[in-house]
Amino acid sequence: MRIAIATCRRKPEPDPDEAPLLAALRARGADVELLAWDDPAAPRPADFDRMVLRSTWNYPEDPDGFRAWCERSAAETELWNPLPALRWNLHKRYLLDLQVRGIPVVPTALLARGAAADLLELAADRGWTDVVIKPAIEN
């Protein structure tokens, strides 16, 4: 079986799980390859039997392009990340959806695009000492 592990050309940091994942799949007989979603010279998803989206960290830089790539990929090969789930979690509001369902998540606050906010005050009001800031991405 030929498996693509979707990633991106420029990763913000090394992925410590990447090498063990590739080794485990290869040990089970899979022909596995990293496939950068944002590399026009990369093989097409149709060249693979299956694909899993793994470390496509830079999709916030081109959310429309990434969304279109996911749609094309789903038409060409079997995605192990179901397309409806991919669409749903492209926007960080999915964290609030999970929280409402009682699923533990990192405490989350969404800010409207362009909103003036004092992040230190927001964190202090919520009792947060550690903060992660990510783009929400519009659907």
Q: What are these model-predicted stretches?
A:
Residues 1-28:
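Short, charged N-terminal beta->alpha structural module
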Residues 15-19, 63, 67, 92-95:
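Short, surface-exposed alpha-helical segments at coil->helix boundaries
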Residues 31-74, 80-89:
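N-terminal glycine-rich "phosphate-gripper" loop used for MgATP/nucleotide binding
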Residues 15, 36-39, 44, 62, ...:
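Serine/threonine-rich low-complexity intrinsically disordered regions
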Residues 10-11, 58, 138-139:
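Short, solvent-exposed loop/turn segments at secondary-structure junctions
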Residues 2-7, 70-75, 84-139:
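Active-site nucleotide/adenylate-binding loops and adjacent lid/helix of ATP-dependent enzymes
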Residues 29-30, 100:
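Extended interaction regions within the primary functional domain
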